[in-house]
């Protein structure tokens, strides 16, 4: 894929490293991978919080505290069908509830834009959109940008170019800007080994490989989006 879960997980880890109390929410409600990327057991999920109508403050101990004491994880529902019970009104409630206990919220969204995502986009302060120089990824990113433009959400979008230095891409960074008609605010280098190892360990590379260029790139991104944010982007399935 384009790497949005990797970016979301490490962006949240970077906020926490900076000293901000951060909640990473897996909003890929049916097939989210945040729990795997952070090596947490989804004992308390988005579904549990919303369907049990929990007041967050006295139940903060249910959240999973990660490696950094400032980073908390709210995984996607355990069963894909549980996502069907979550509606747009609940999205607003979720953000309002979480905002009372955290400095920063980072939502990892699914590849497909649905009504719940659109509600989340409208309520967010920033939308971090991840893409690569893969032509199929750029085509799908353009489609998503067009949707958000019609909803007058373009001003919230921050475009990130992942794996920008991968030798397999023939498109250069300037071409991306021309194709999508939007500035790229940050680039992230291509390092399969670091990313793969960090996922297998369940520890964001911000912590497991803190001195790698890819970790520095995420920290630079964090300095540009120091607000609640949604991380989205179209994944491209390789055949």
Mark where each language-model region is.
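Conserved C-terminal guanine-recognition region of P-loop GTPase G domains, centered on the G4
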Residues: 142-154
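Cytosolic-facing regulatory segments adjacent to core modules
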Residues: 52-118, 138
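Conserved Switch II/interswitch segment of TRAFAC-class P-loop GTPases
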Residues: 124-142
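Phosphate-binding loop that captures ATP/GTP phosphates
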Residues: 15-73
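Beta-strand-loop-alpha "switch" segments that mediate conformational coupling across diverse proteins
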Residues: 163, 177-205, 218
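G-domain G4 guanine-recognition motif of GTPases
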Residues: 132, 157-169, 187-193
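Walker A (P-loop) phosphate-binding motif
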Residues: 1-23
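NTP-binding/hydrolysis catalytic cores, primarily Walker-type P-loop NTPases
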Residues: 200-239
């Amino acid at each position: 894929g384009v790497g949005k879960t990797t970016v979301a997980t490490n962006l949240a880890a970077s906020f926490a490293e900076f000293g901000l109390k951060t909640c990473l929410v897996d909003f890929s409600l049916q097939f989210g991978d945040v729990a795997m990327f952070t090596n947490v057991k989804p004992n308390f999920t988005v579904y549990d919080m919303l369907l049990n109508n929990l007041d967050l403050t006295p139940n903060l101990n249910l959240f999973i505290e990660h490696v950094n004491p400032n980073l908390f994880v709210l995984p996607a529902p355990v069963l894909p069908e549980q996502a069907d019970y979550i509606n747009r009104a609940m999205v607003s409630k979720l953000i309002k509830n979480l905002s009372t206990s955290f400095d920063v919220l980072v939502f990892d969204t699914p590849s497909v834009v649905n009504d719940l995502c659109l509600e989340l986009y409208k309520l967010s302060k920033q939308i971090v959109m991840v893409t690569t120089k893969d032509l199929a990824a750029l085509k799908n990113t353009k489609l998503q940008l067009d949707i958000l433009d019609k909803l007058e959400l373009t001003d919230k979008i921050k475009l990130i170019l992942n794996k920008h230095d991968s030798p397999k891409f023939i498109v250069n960074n300037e071409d991306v800007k021309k194709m999508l008609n939007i500035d790229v605010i940050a680039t992230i280098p291509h390092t399969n080994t670091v990313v793969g190892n960090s996922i297998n360990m369940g520890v964001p590379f911000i912590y497991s490989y803190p001195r790698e260029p890819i970790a520095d790139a995420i920290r630079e991104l964090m300095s540009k989006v120091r607000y609640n944010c949604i991380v989205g982007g179209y994944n491209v399935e390789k055949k």
